[in-house]
A protein has these predicted regions:
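Functional transmembrane core segments of multi-pass inner-membrane proteins
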Residues: 48-94
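Intramembrane alpha-helical segments
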Residues: 1-63
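Hydrophobic alpha-helical transmembrane segments of multipass integral membrane proteins
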Residues: 4, 23-30, 76-79, 134-141
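Multi-pass membrane catalytic core of lipid/isoprenoid biosynthesis enzymes
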Residues: 1-17, 110-139
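Alpha-helical transmembrane segments
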Residues: 13, 17, 24, 33-37, ...
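Cytosolic, membrane-interface loops and tails of multi-pass inner-membrane proteins
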Residues: 85-125
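Cytoplasm-facing juxtamembrane segments at the starts of transmembrane helices
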Residues: 39-47, 98-99, 122-132
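Juxtamembrane boundary at the C-terminal end of a transmembrane helix
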Residues: 140-148
Length: 148
């Protein structure tokens, strides 16, 4: 609601074009969060577009008053980063929330056996998520430093 209110103020004071971004953003939030239209917008691809690419396109347009190749490339990069995060986090979240029991083992070629449990299965994707989060903070800081 706050973003929509700010968008309306910006649309009135700056440019009517912002209303397109405000309307689309409002629809994305409603359709995704409420599962409208048979959950067609509640997918990994829509998540990546809605929370990765779309904010980049919106903020780029607000700052440049145009969308160009740089905006598209930045949006695609953020789409892919968000999709990566979603790909890693979905199975981890599923194991944490829904698994009652996880057991098994991996037998290596040298005869060694590694025990599988929920913690060992989610350890690698969780570490990747932590590193991805840290990378985004450093990337954002670098972009900010570049602009200052």
């Amino acid at each position: 609601a706050g973003a929509v209110a700010l968008g309306i103020v910006a649309g009135i004071s700056e440019s009517r074009w912002i209303f397109a971004f405000v309307a689309f953003g409002g629809l994305i939030v409603a359709f995704y969060n409420l599962g409208l239209w048979n959950n067609r917008f509640h997918t990994d691809l829509w998540f990546a577009f809605s929370w990765g690419a779309f904010p980049v396109l919106t903020s780029y347009w607000v700052n440049a008053s145009r969308l160009d190749l740089a905006a598209v490339l930045l949006a695609v990069g953020c789409f892919l980063l968000t999709l990566t995060q979603r790909t890693l986090s979905t199975p981890v979240r599923s194991i944490r929330r829904r698994a009652i029991k996880v057991e098994g083992e991996i037998q290596l070629a040298n005869g060694e056996r590694l025990t599988l449990d929920s913690e060992s299965i989610i350890a690698v994707p969780e570490r990747a998520l932590l590193l991805l989060g840290a990378a985004m903070v450093v990337l954002a800081a670098g972009l900010l430093a570049f602009r200052l």
